[in-house]
Curated annotation (Swiss-Prot):
<dbReference type="Pfam" id="PF00156">
    <property type="entry name" value="Pribosyltran"/>
</dbReference>
<keyword id="KW-0328">Glycosyltransferase</keyword>
<keyword id="KW-0804">Transcription</keyword>
<protein>
    <recommendedName>
        <fullName>Bifunctional protein PyrR</fullName>
        <ecNumber>2.4.2.9</ecNumber>
    </recommendedName>
</protein>
<dbReference type="InterPro" id="IPR023050">
    <property type="entry name" value="PyrR"/>
</dbReference>
<comment type="function">
    <text>Also displays a weak uracil phosphoribosyltransferase activity which is not physiologically significant.</text>
</comment>
<keyword id="KW-0808">Transferase</keyword>
<comment type="similarity">
    <text>Belongs to the purine/pyrimidine phosphoribosyltransferase family. PyrR subfamily.</text>
</comment>
<comment type="function">
    <text>Regulates the transcription of the pyrimidine nucleotide (pyr) operon in response to exogenous pyrimidines.</text>
</comment>
<dbReference type="GO" id="GO:0006355">
    <property type="term" value="P:regulation of DNA-templated transcription"/>
</dbReference>
<dbReference type="InterPro" id="IPR029057">
    <property type="entry name" value="PRTase-like"/>
</dbReference>
<dbReference type="InterPro" id="IPR000836">
    <property type="entry name" value="PRibTrfase_dom"/>
</dbReference>
<keyword id="KW-0805">Transcription regulation</keyword>
<dbReference type="InterPro" id="IPR050137">
    <property type="entry name" value="PyrR_bifunctional"/>
</dbReference>
<feature type="short sequence motif" description="PRPP-binding">
    <location>
        <begin position="100"/>
        <end position="112"/>
    </location>
</feature>
<dbReference type="GO" id="GO:0004845">
    <property type="term" value="F:uracil phosphoribosyltransferase activity"/>
</dbReference>
């Protein structure tokens, strides 16, 4: 069973709202960089970057972050053909003394964000990391909290939340898949 909880128009309105929140929170955008966690987080980061530029005239430096080697669940993969493939980060971005806007699609246990923060240290010591999450579904295992949330969606552990993006899925929407 599938239920669409955010359609295309609401998806883009959510991008716009989060972009406004980022601009409003910071007196200046000069020391901000935006980093999207591959794959869907990176596409959401790209949408945010474009919208912030439309609203402020400032093009934030950005990067796609691959966290493959920083994950703590690789030992749980029992088949070699199921192992994730490292595709690298899109470019090197010096985050030293910058405020990093870290972007991902779904916040669940918090483990992906922990891995992303570990990966970010390879690019310098950020002054601050702020977290943008498109959908927060709860069920945290680590003390991770988002600074900007598109939508809070209470779920059961059996449900799956899918954030769908144009490049990955051919559309912008969010669905809950249940049993």
């Amino acid at each position: 069973m599938e239920k669409i909880i955010i359609d295309h128009d609401r998806f883009l309105r959510t991008i716009s709202r989060i972009s406004h929140e980022i601009i409003e929170k910071h007196q200046t955008l000069d020391d901000l960089v935006i980093v999207g966690i591959k794959r869907r987080g990176a596409e959401i980061a790209e949408l945010l970057q474009r919208r912030v530029e439309e609203l402020s005239g400032i093009n934030l430096p950005s990067m796609e972050l691959d966290i493959t080697f920083y994950r703590d669940d690789l030992t749980l993969v029992d088949q070699e053909d199921k192992m994730p493939v490292y595709s690298g980060s899109s470019q090197y971005l010096n985050i030293q003394d910058k405020t990093v806007i870290l972007v991902d699609d779904v916040l669940f246990t918090g483990r992906t964000i922990r891995a992303a923060m570990d990966a970010l240290t390879d690019f310098g010591r950020a002054a601050k990391i702020e977290l943008v999450i498109f959908v927060d579904r709860g069920h945290r295992e680590l003390p991770i909290r988002a600074d900007y949330v598109g939508k809070n969606v209470p779920t059961s552990r059996d449900e799956l939340v899918q954030v769908r993006t144009e490049k990955q899925d051919g559309c912008y929407e969010v669905a809950i898949l249940g049993k």
